Amino acid sequence: GHTSRPHLTTDLVYALGTVITQMPALLTRKLDPRAAAVMVWGAVQSGEAANAIPREGVLRGTLRLMDRRSWDAAEGMVRDLITQLLAPLDARFELDYRRGVPPVMNEAVSTELMRTAAQRALCANAVRDAEQSTGAEDFAVFLDRVPGSLARLGVWDGIIPRVDLHSSQFVADERAVAAGVRLMTHTMLAALHH
């Protein structure tokens, strides 16, 4: 279509913009707020000319959730919301929803075993609660099948500037390897005696 006659075609760029701007907000109204839904768009592609309305477009993004129930329901919810958003715009879509790993759900007994083992292996003030991350973690697949607990091992030496894990400037203090071995050994022994 031509931009001088948008009423004669489906304005695909407008449709993509509608999904981009409305989907994240609508998900927060459909999902339990404790799921902490984080939808972020990483790529949008459609058309090249300023005066032509393209026929096709691609939108790519990620949806991260903090609880399993919401993670299980998300695909159907995303499909339904896109359908509702695009219906008045007369736009069709194909959804290629690829589930990543589920959210990490630590089991309480395993978590307490590891916490106690860490206090013994390292020291009492070396153990801190960490905020749940929206990053994908493959260990979640194991926790789906077997009770367990995921912990983060601090690897900052306290001297060099602290940077994000994914930064090109990230340097792990290799002394953390020995601390990790002590932690896992104490955790394993505690589990055997539990």
Model region roles, listed by residue range:
Residues A15, A25, R29, G76-D80, ...:
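His/Asp/Glu-rich mid-to-C-terminal helical/loop segments that flank catalytic regions of hydrolases
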Residues G57, L63, L153-I159:
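Short, small-residue-rich loop/turn micro-motifs
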